[in-house]
Amino acid sequence: MIPCDLFGAAGEYRPSYNRDEEERLEKDLRALSSAPPKDALAKIKTLAAEHAPRSTWVWATLGEAPLALAIGHLRDMAEVVQTSGNPSTWEALAEYYSMLGWKADRSMLRALDAARSTATTKAVTAAIRAVYLPWLEKFSTLTQALATTYPATGPQTCRTLPAEEGTVYLFADGLRMDLARVLEEKLISSGLEVRFEHGWSALPTVTATAKHAWMPLAGKLGGPLEGEGFEPKEQSSGKTITHARFKQLLEELGTSFLIYDVTFFPTGCAWTEFGSIDTYGHNQGAKLAWRVEEELAGLQQRILELIHVGWTKIKVITDHGWLLLPGGLPKAELPKHLAASRWNRCAIPSAGAQHGYPMTSWFWDSAEAVVLAPGVSCFVSGMEYSHGGLTLQEALIPSLTLSTKQTGGVKSVVLKEMKWSGMRLNMVLEGAQGLPVDVRSKVADATTSFSANPITGAADGQKTSLLVADDEAIGAAAFLVVVDQNGQPIFKQPIVIGENLYATRRIRPNRC
């Protein structure tokens, strides 16, 4: 017999009760679309308190209570919005957003991530637009009121990225402040020392302008604006910087370019790129919220791989942030005849155009004017994700400098030499003594091993030898992998089985 109190008043074990409560919460959230911001804030807090118990029930674990989870994030967002203040200097704005304001962005994304069906997304969207949009507009007004004194006004004001021995600059397009703060938490939990800093992006806040805004590279670039883009030109040739030329310039500055998924030998100074945050945002709009965690997990893994192979310092940098608003950012009218080039959040004005919108100078040539979309609006309708304007979300950019703790929180493995002799791989590793060494087609999957027998790393400076069992594997792409005592990969190096392109690789000084 079922105990009489099994289906008690709370209804924790009744799926029908949970469904009814989800429907009620959905209705209450959708009603916020017509509520004043103050009333919406109060209602969100009330609803969060009412539905908080359901977020711990089994139905939430099973994915049957998405709104019970989302309302908690909406409450967190509301609490930040209510304590926002009115900072009126660049320093005060930066301090507010880097320390507190970013939490509203994070909570908003988490609420969207929790609610993925059409119905629940509409409900969460109504709450976000009622509370978060007014907050965005308030701070965009505060920020744009200071536009004439913007801190980053040209190459002489931009950051410096010196070519330092053992350093990798990891560029992550669109790594906004809130995502960087979450990444910081992940990296600290991984045992890394993290120094978090922030600065101002180049204007307009688009990749074409902002990616190259660092010294000494910026000293080689300039204007004027030509065509429809915001790309700087190389002063010596007058040509726009292509990706291929960017890589050449890095080499000239003493910095190697590491392609994706390659760690290489940790010598000299390097630049690498990772992530698709900005791409997902442009392609999927508000659904970017569903991708954030996997993007950050991938970025964390890439950083740890670089540390594990022996790079002593990783500096994560970005070019710009972005605005995201489910249901679309407001529209600002800018007729085509008033703009020589019109982007979502910025434009190149036509000669003599009268439009009444905020203006700034182009980062690469102060003689060139740029129109900024007012507030958080776009010159194109229906955009849920955009950047190019002047808001804290777009313009205040983070950087993270990472290194291993002096106490040795992360074990580093360094590959010193590697050579194939037939199907036998001979190598010299540092930091791998007693750890399992393998050759696999998939780094984290031990079942994809090519090794004839399990082996462990030799002492530092001594040769470790591994035999590949299957002659038919010659020429196959694989990874040399070192794992810790828990079976977790801590080092990987792409290889080609049996290929002598990797004839004895010894570290040669390549000072930056």
Regions found by a protein language model. Name each.
Residues 1-167, 174-512:
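…; additionally, a secondary subgroup of soluble metalloenzymes is captured
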